[in-house]
Amino acid sequence: MKMQSNVIKIIIVISLLIGVGALYLLLSLRTPEKPLAGQVNIYEDNVKIGGDFELIDQNGEIFNSDELKGNLSLIYFGFTSCPDICPTSLNKMTEIVEILNKHKIDILPVFITIDPKRDTPIVLKEYLKHFHPKFIGLTGNEQQIKGVTDKFKVFYARVNGDDDDPNYMLDHSSFTYLIDANGKYLKHFYLDSSPKEIMEFLKGN
């Protein structure tokens, strides 16, 4: 009987040791904390983001991406008929530009349309009057827009209306891309990212 009791005690001790070991292993292998919401690695999944492009600005002039070099820039892809996400993002970009200007940091806000059929230079110019005066609006033909959206890994697709419907809508990814003074991609931020997050990132770099 005594031997049976000792065996039970040994089994209990071994079970406890196994449990503690399993818990330690679980904790040591847990997923590390995520970065601040909205921030991603410079190259996510080893995919290059960004690159050179040439489009047409809101004044009808040819605009080359080299013109952005020398300053930080924020680039957003959207369309002027977008009912909510785009104006919200552009308002946030306006706020970011104003905050950075107070800290003596120059940054250029850029809006590239994914709807070149409707967003002509004239339409862009009128639309951007509602946002920061530094905004650069860019359009082009469908091939040019496809080229630049491919480089920035932007998703967009028509979601309603037939080919003759002028009131069609577009579904699209909503990222704000931060580009350095050499024209290289640094980060992209999500719609819910705050200006403070971008400021903190810039201070750390």
Curated annotation (Swiss-Prot):
Record's InterPro entries?
Answer: SCO1/SenC, Thioredoxin-like_sf
Q: Which top-level group of life is the source organism from?
A: Bacteria
The similarity comment for this entry is: Belongs to the SCO1/2 family.
Listed Gene3D superfamilies: Glutaredoxin
Origin organism is Rickettsia felis (strain ATCC VR-1525 / URRWXCal2) (Rickettsia azadi)
Q: Which GO MF terms does the UniProt record name? A: metal ion binding
Keyword Repressor set for record: no
Q: Which residues does the annotation say bind Cu cation? A: 82, 86, 172
User: Taxonomy-wise, where does this protein's organism fall, top ranks first?
Assistant: Bacteria, Pseudomonadati, Pseudomonadota, Alphaproteobacteria, Rickettsiales
Please tell me whether the keyword Metal-binding is annotated for this protein: yes
Q: Which CDD domains match?
A: SCO (cd02968)
Instruction: List keywords of the entry alphabetically.
Output: Copper, Metal-binding
Descriptive protein name: SCO2-like protein RF_0960
